Regions:
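Short beta-strand edge/turn micro-motifs at domain boundaries
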Residues: 114-116, 131-163
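Surface-exposed, charged secondary-structure patches
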Residues: 83-129
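Soluble non-cytosolic domains of exported or imported proteins
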Residues: 23, 27, 49-52, 78-82, ...
Length: 163
């Protein structure tokens, strides 16, 4: 009986430990950042409906007060929530393919309700009738937990290597 009880206690401790880790703020921010990146990856075979769903997923990750700054070769701009939603919709419907990879993700918890994710990024896009464009740079996401306990992006920065 003691061996069985010990075995059950060990199994329960492992399960509880895994759940605590899985639902920690850092892991939630990492999973949601991965989800954001997936909304920017477009396969040529994706249907228009599937691409529109990516815009829904993308905007659900954003706080209403989100700001975004892009500073890459030959392009600089700032975006609000409405701008990001419109631009993402245009993007997913007007590219043939897009591949965004984020490496060396570092998550710093700034407080109980704020976190910062930094990553190296590599992005390549093929537009309709346009040569493939590529950019390497840094991606920074500031996340904040809202009153409902959901993590949302409050600021996003995409900087080219030379910036």
């Amino acid at each position: 009986m003691n061996k069985r009880l010990f075995f059950v206690v060990v199994i329960m401790a492992v399960i509880v430990g895994f759940l605590i880790w899985r639902y920690s703020d850092a892991q939630i921010v990492k999973r949601q950042s991965d989800m954001l990146i997936k909304t920017l990856n477009i396969a040529g075979s994706e249907t228009k409906s599937f691409r529109i769903l990516k815009t829904n997923t993308f905007t659900n990750l954003l706080a209403n007060s989100v700001t975004c700054r892009v500073d890459i070769a030959n392009y600089r701009s700032n975006f609000s929530y409405d701008d990001l939603e419109a631009q993402h919709h245009l993007f997913v419907n007007n590219v043939d393919t897009s591949s965004l990879k984020a490496n060396n993700m570092i998550i710093n918890k700034l407080s109980d309700s704020e976190a910062k994710l930094s990553a190296d990024m590599s992005w390549s896009v093929t537009g309709k009738g346009v040569d493939r464009l590529s950019e390497n740079g840094k991606l920074t996401l500031l996340w904040k937990k809202n009153t409902a306990g959901k993590w949302r992006i409050t600021h996003m920065e995409i900087n080219g290597i030379d910036h």
